[in-house]
């Protein structure tokens, strides 16, 4: 009796290890979160003559699934319900009618970790390949976007910056690009895996951060890259010197030098004119003073018949007249002296007064 009970078990085990049913698949695969992977797979099964015209359906199940109750994660059977969390992300790309059971996984998520097995059904022929199974490992997303800057950044000149994720999958959900920058920017054209930012930097933007952030919405993960802007600033109107060259320098530099030279020459000429004018005024004033002194001396003629008293009085007033030329004596006394002298003297001034006149002229 115990032997009769063992016979069905042995028969089931023989079906499970039936050499007519075999499968080749990569036993372990690793994929980064948010990315995709394609797992090649091939299987074989015997085809009874009565099932030759039956369609072939393939299914991928999680390890431990109960076929009659649990839904597969992927299948080529159109009316078959699949697991909600894997719908649209797990796909049976291979054609089971051609013995192809290849599986595609896109927008990989952490909860996709685990083992999976394949099952085929063709008419009355149905078989689950429990060995080997596929083991899926989902790791952190370590890839980062790449930022391309063509040429150098100059203040006031627009440049197109490109952020790309060439390592992303074509079949997955298109990533979402975001830019963060303090400089004036605007969005340019974009493709599935790249975005263009039009930036017009300013001098104060040198050394500031620019970030390109990429979100993979299908997996809920984000990656980014940050760079520092290198804005090359060259002064537009330098006037500190003239540098030799081939004549191809900027007009602004030459104009600045010419304007500086003209301004310097103008200032120099103005100073020279002021000095000449001052010198002319002083010289003219002194000449007038000298002529006035000579005229006053001529209005005091002396005669031989003049009394000694008158001569003495005239000599006493001589220094007063000389002082009056320099503005030291009062004008009233000067007029009185001139009136008195004109009535009493008819001769030339003494030689002493003449020498005094030339002594004053030499002081000019």
Swiss-Prot record:
Please, which domain of life does this record's source organism belong to? Eukaryota
Which sites does the entry annotate for glycosylation?
A: 100, 113, 160, 209, 230
Q: In which tissues is it expressed?
A: Monocytic/myeloid lineage cells. In the brain, CD33 is mainly expressed on microglial cells.
Question: One GO BP annotation here?
Answer: negative regulation of tumor necrosis factor production
TM ranges are 260-282
- Which parts of the sequence bind D-galactose? 154
GO CC term, one of those recorded: peroxisome
Which stretch carries the motif ITIM motif 2? 356-361
Query: What is the recorded phenotype of mutating residue 358 to A/F?
Result: Reduces binding to PTPN6
CDD domains (alphabetical)? IgC2_CD33_d2_like, IgV_CD33
Keyword flag Protein biosynthesis: no
Any one Pfam family here would be ig
Boundaries of each Ig-like V-type domain copy? 19-135
Extracellular-side stretches of the chain, per the record, are 18-259
Q: Which residues participate in N-acetylneuraminate binding? A: 119
Q: Name all Ig-like C2-type domain ranges.
A: 145-228
Query: Can you summarize the PTM annotation of this record?
Result: Glycosylated. Glycosylation at Asn-100 is critical for regulating ligand recognition. Phosphorylation of Tyr-340 is involved in binding to PTPN6 and PTPN11. Phosphorylation of Tyr-358 is involved in binding to PTPN6. LCK phosphorylates Tyr-340 efficiently and Tyr-358 to a lesser extent.
| InterPro entries in alphabetical order | Ig-like_dom (IPR007110), Ig-like_dom_sf (IPR036179), Ig-like_fold (IPR013783), Ig_sub (IPR003599), Ig_V-set (IPR013106), Immunoglobulin_dom (IPR013151), SIGLEC (IPR051036)
Q: Which family does it belong to?
A: Belongs to the immunoglobulin superfamily. SIGLEC (sialic acid binding Ig-like lectin) family.
Domain text? Contains 2 copies of a cytoplasmic motif that is referred to as the immunoreceptor tyrosine-based inhibitor motif (ITIM). This motif is involved in modulation of cellular responses. The phosphorylated ITIM motif can bind the SH2 domain of several SH2-containing phosphatases.
Q: Per its record, how is this protein called by name?
A: Myeloid cell surface antigen CD33
What would be the name of the gene that encodes this protein? CD33
